[in-house]
Amino acid sequence: MEQEQGTLPACAYAHISSVLEVSRDEIADIWPLKQGLTNESWHFITPEGEYVYRQPGVGTEDLVDRKAEAEALKLARSIGLDGTFIHEDVEQGWKLSRFLVDCRELDAHDAEQVACAMRMARTLHESGAHLARTFDFYEEGKRYEALLRELGPITVPGYDELAAKADRVAAFAHADGAPVCITHNDFFNLNILIDRSDRMHLIDWEYAG
């Protein structure tokens, strides 16, 4: 089956050329990948291999700290958790990664795969590494809530009751005083890819902290 052919954003060609040191004419086989909630991505090839170009979506500057993401990606690459990352521009948010040919997502019903994924999580949690960013699910949720309220009242049925429960749970968690460690914070099967050599890659580090 042939892939839908496409074109990259005009600025992408210069970005790719500057990092991969290829000419525009060497960038080919472009097609859009399934879009995420916050970004748009395209597959492309050069004489050196297959890659992914990611362009941040409109408004993501309010949701994602790109400097923190780049710091996390470099860490993940250095400790062997993500072999796809190549480069991110922290000012504009675009990113280049290696495309994993014939990769598959983690099968949550495969005990061996899940065990391997858990070992990856433990490697991260016990790495002793630190990131400048602190990610707190509750505080992030309250920040998103504030952004929504700038647009008007939140009318989702049951929202206020659920928010009150979150307030109570957060208070208990903070009172616990448990030590913190670096975490991925978007750890689920779509972000855990297995390549043709059965190596796992933990991708999408936008919320790590």
Language-model-derived ranges and their functions:
Residues 21-28, 68-69, 165-176:
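Short Pro/Gly-enriched beta-strand edge/turn motifs at strand-loop
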Residues 6-11, 67, 161-164:
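A generic alpha-helix signature
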Residues 1-29:
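Juxta-kinase regulatory segment immediately upstream of eukaryotic protein kinase catalytic domains
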Residues 24-27, 78, 199:
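A broad structural signal for short, well-ordered beta-strand segments within beta-sheet-rich domains
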Residues 31-139, 144-161, 175-179:
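ATP-binding pocket architecture of kinase catalytic cores
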Residues 31-46, 52-53, 168-209:
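Active-site acidic catalytic loop and adjacent metal/ATP-binding pocket
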